[in-house]
């Protein structure tokens, strides 16, 4: 394993996966450090993407080239439009996803991204030189 990377992303959660993917697609040699490669972008006990708040974030990330929305589309079990009894401004799409497939799709996506390397380990400390770099 080489230790020459432009960017190190610690944590393979949703944000870490998106950050590592974006950095690598922009041409930076990127290492994603995760504690468990089988649980990349692991979903909670309620494996939903969407809703009023998270749905807005997912749409913004998608507009910038993110991967969560595409992976959600591939792993959706059920789709609902929330708040239909309220005005159209409150409507919000939500997708229930297959937890295992969601993580597996993220892993496949990351493993096939040029300039992106994944390492399973734990970060114990961060070391800086005297210039703070």
Identify what each model region corresponds to.
Residues 132-133:
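Short, hydrophobic/aromatic-rich segments at coil-to-beta transitions
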Residues 2-15:
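Beta1/beta-strand and adjacent pyrophosphate-binding region of the FAD-binding site
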Residues 21-129:
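Conserved N-terminal/central alpha/beta ligand/cofactor-binding core
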